[in-house]
């Protein structure tokens, strides 16, 4: 299992939002590149980066910063936020991003999404962001009008390589992961699943471990590793030994 430390970028700094609210911001670092390098020193095997400005505006806003992160790390980077056309996706992959996380495009423009998956096989994942199973889009501010389970056959057919599932009600709230929902999701798809939202303690990491055999690839952690309720190095050590 991989624990992906999150570097969420807004206005050029590293922040965390509570439940995706743009006005519920906590700044954790003024230097996202240094923060990314720190997580690598702590044993990270993969970095999760989100361009929050891009997610809310629909266009890339922190390209140079993200390019710098990729160039200064030896571990791979996955990126989401504001990637809504093939040109933007290509630009990021050429800049060194290993794989991309697509949200709105996958829900609203399936033809372009399928074209993107065909152009970059194995590198395009889908972000499924939900409240009570109902998907949200456009930076979590709009109801997508479809459930998580309804969309799965469509994204599989389009050629998606993996799923990141966020329980919005738990994101940034440090309330623990929804193991039952994740288990059900893993059982409904052949794609690897990454959990996001609610990973708050080492106990949450331990609770997710049994799902690895069902298709869970790992979990994204943000708020918890910045506030210290989850010691990232300790979590990595536990995973290595179990």
Swiss-Prot record:
It is an enzyme of class 5 (isomerase). GO terms for biological process: L-histidine biosynthetic process; L-tryptophan biosynthetic process. Keywords: Amino-acid biosynthesis, Cytoplasm, Histidine biosynthesis, Isomerase. InterPro entries: Aldolase_TIM, His_biosynth, HisA_bact_arch, Isoase_HisA-like, Isoase_HisA-like_bact, RibuloseP-bd_barrel. The keyword Amino-acid biosynthesis applies. It is found in: Cytoplasm. Coiled coil: none annotated. The active site is at 8 (proton acceptor), 129 (proton donor). Pathway: Amino-acid biosynthesis; L-histidine biosynthesis; L-histidine from 5-phospho-alpha-D-ribose 1-diphosphate: step 4/9. It catalyses: 1-(5-phospho-beta-D-ribosyl)-5-[(5-phospho-beta-D-ribosylamino)methylideneamino]imidazole-4-carboxamide = 5-[(5-phospho-1-deoxy-D-ribulos-1-ylimino)methylamino]-1-(5-phospho-beta-D-ribosyl)imidazole-4-carboxamide. GO terms for cellular component: cytoplasm. Belongs to the HisA/HisF family. This is 1-(5-phosphoribosyl)-5-[(5-phosphoribosylamino)methylideneamino] imidazole-4-carboxamide isomerase. It comes from Maridesulfovibrio salexigens (strain ATCC 14822 / DSM 2638 / NCIMB 8403 / VKM B-1763) (Desulfovibrio salexigens).
């Amino acid at each position: 299992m991989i624990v992906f430390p999150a570097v969420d970028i807004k206005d050029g700094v590293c922040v965390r939002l509570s439940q995706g609210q743009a006005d519920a911001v906590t700044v954790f670092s003024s230097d996202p590149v240094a923060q990314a390098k720190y997580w690598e020193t702590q044993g990270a095997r993969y970095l999760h980066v989100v361009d929050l400005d891009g997610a809310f505006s629909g266009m890339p806003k922190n390209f140079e910063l993200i390019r710098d992160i990729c160039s200064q790390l030896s571990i791979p980077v996955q990126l989401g936020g504001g990637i809504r056309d093939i040109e933007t996706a290509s630009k990021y992959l050429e800049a060194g991003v290993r794989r991309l996380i697509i949200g709105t495009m996958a829900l609203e423009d399936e033809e372009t999404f399928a074209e993107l998956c065909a152009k970059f096989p194995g590198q395009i994942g889908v972000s499924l962001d939900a409240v009570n199973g109902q998907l949200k889009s456009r930076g979590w501010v709009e109801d997508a009008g479809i459930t998580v389970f309804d969309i799965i056959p469509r994204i599989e057919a389009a050629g998606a390589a993996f799923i990141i599932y966020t329980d919005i009600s738990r994101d940034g709230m440090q309330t623990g992961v929804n193991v039952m929902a994740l288990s059900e999701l893993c059982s409904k798809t052949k794609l690897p699943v990454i959990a996001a939202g609610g990973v708050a303690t080492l106990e949450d990491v331990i609770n997710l471990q049994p799902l690895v055999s069902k298709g869970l690839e790992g979990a994204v952690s943000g708020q918890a590793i910045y506030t210290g309720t989850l010691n990232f190095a300790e979590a990595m050590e536990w995973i290595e030994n179990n």
